[in-house]
Amino acid sequence: MKKIQLNSIASSCSLSGQRLDLVLSKLFREYSRSYLKKLIIMNQVLVNESIVNQPDKKILGGETLTIHPFSKDLLVDIPENIFLDIVYEDSDILIINKPAGLVVHPGSGNKSGTILNALLYHYKNSKDLPRAGIVHRLDKDTSGLMVIAKNIFSYNHLLLLLKEKKIIREYEGIVHGKMIAGGTINKPIMRHYNRRTCMMVHHLGKPSVTHYKVLSRFKFHTHIAIRLETGRTHQIRVHMLHIKYPLVGDPCYSGFKIQSNYRKDKKTNKIYKFPRQALHANHLSLHHPIKKNVMSWTVPLPQDIQELLLKI
């Protein structure tokens, strides 16, 4: 991409505590907030000469903010004919079953081949909606249910339901270790200091609550059900590591001490090398934006996790 120019400006202390994308829209008024948000996501914004790719990062005030603008037509998301596994659809919402390996929306390293690109292809009106109607995300290698808005009324309604914690999102996962019982994890989460693609539990983070219960126990593993009360980035994965029961196959959050006899067992050693986090969003429940009735959807575990359960 050809850069147009380089712009730097010092932020005022009066902007302390405000979101980065909002601050940029106030300082660089020639650009829209949505355009600036895309620049942030694409690693084209520096805060004190360090790349920041979080639009919601809070500004302290006094930092030097630098943007690398691109021609706006180069930032347009392209419609792509990507298959969507549709579980339910009406004129207001779409429920899909996302496979592992599919990214939700374009970002650094994933400029195309995402659910957003697929929505732009299959639903022409989605181009007029924020993020093509996407109101929540699943990690690339987490499979399962997502709700997507098909009009602006539904989009705003679903965002409100999420804010009020009125969308029930339940998961199944397989963790390392033999759990005794279920419980609730109430620990704040923030971005990791050094590993910028990972998150961590920290007292300065955002409030995060995860409920879990045991479905079945095995020699070295536990099959669990999880319900989110909040929806932070990597929340389940971070919380499971925090209580020392990390998800099988998690590339970012499996750094823990394994029982001495664990890797000596050939079967469990293969399980340790499962190619993605063993996590699936199996259940979704919400009040329909227009019909107002409660609707629920449940999908089975994907084949790879079903086979994993047979191995443990």
Curated annotation (Swiss-Prot):
GO molecular function, a single term: RNA binding
Q: State if rRNA processing is listed as a keyword.
A: yes
All copies of the S4 RNA-binding domain together span 18-87
Q: What is its EC number?
A: 5.4.99.23
**Where is the protein found, in the record's own terms?**
Cytoplasm
User: What keywords appear on the UniProt entry?
Assistant: Cytoplasm, Isomerase, RNA-binding, rRNA processing
Matches recorded under Gene3D superfamilies: Pseudouridine synthase (3.30.2350.10), RNA-binding S4 domain (3.10.290.10)
This protein's major location comes to cytoplasm
Q: Name one Pfam family in it.
A: PseudoU_synth_2
Domain of life the protein comes from: Bacteria
* Enzyme class, spelled out: isomerase
Q: Which reaction does it catalyse?
A: uridine(1911/1915/1917) in 23S rRNA = pseudouridine(1911/1915/1917) in 23S rRNA
A GO cellular component annotation here is:
cytoplasm
Record: active site: 139
Could you tell me which PROSITE patterns the record lists for this protein?
Answer: PSI_RLU (PS01129), S4 (PS50889)
GO BP terms: enzyme-directed rRNA pseudouridine synthesis
Q: What does this protein do?
A: Responsible for synthesis of pseudouridine from uracil at positions 1911, 1915 and 1917 in 23S ribosomal RNA.
Q: Which family does it belong to?
A: Belongs to the pseudouridine synthase RluA family.
The protein's name in its UniProt record:
Ribosomal large subunit pseudouridine synthase D
Q: Which organism is it from?
A: Buchnera aphidicola subsp. Acyrthosiphon pisum (strain APS)
Query: What gene is this protein translated from?
Result: rluD
